[in-house]
Every structure is written in structure tokens, then in C-alpha cells.
């Protein structure tokens, strides 16, 4: 029985760590959106539409983040994973 318990405990630990990692990603994403201006979701969608005029991408391939520094400086970071040619 101890051999079976050994394999079962590994699956629980890996699924728990995977769930923790996913939750951290979701929380980080929500934190970045919390301080974003009201126009931010629409701007993100329009950026995706412009890119789609040239290359098909899904929304998961685009990451848009707005970072604000203490010096009243805002930085818009855009990461796009383009498909292979």
C-alpha cells in the first residue's frame, strides 16, 4: 500500500502546485487591470484587431500591461507571439 500512496501523493502535489501557479497568474493579471484606465480594455481590443489585419493571432498570444511608476510615468508594454512563417 505504501507504494500506491507514494504515487498518489505526487499527483496531488503536482496538481496543487499547478493550481497555485495558475492562481498567481490570475491574481497578477487582475492587479494590473485594477489600476488601468477605463479605456484600457477597448484599446487592447483595437490593438489586437490592427495586428489581425496582417497576421492571425488569438487573444492569448497578446499580452498588454500598463505599468505606472512613482514619477507619474506610465509604460505600456505589449508582447505579441507571432506565428511561424
Swiss-Prot record:
It comes from the Bacteria. It holds the Pfam family MinE. InterPro entries: MinE (IPR005527), MinE_sf (IPR036707). Keywords: Cell cycle, Cell division. Prevents the cell division inhibition by proteins MinC and MinD at internal division sites while permitting inhibition at polar sites. This ensures cell division at the proper site by restricting the formation of a division septum at the midpoint of the long axis of the cell. The keyword Phosphoprotein does not apply. The gene is minE. The keyword Cell division applies. This is Cell division topological specificity factor. Belongs to the MinE family. One of its GO terms (biological process) is cell division.
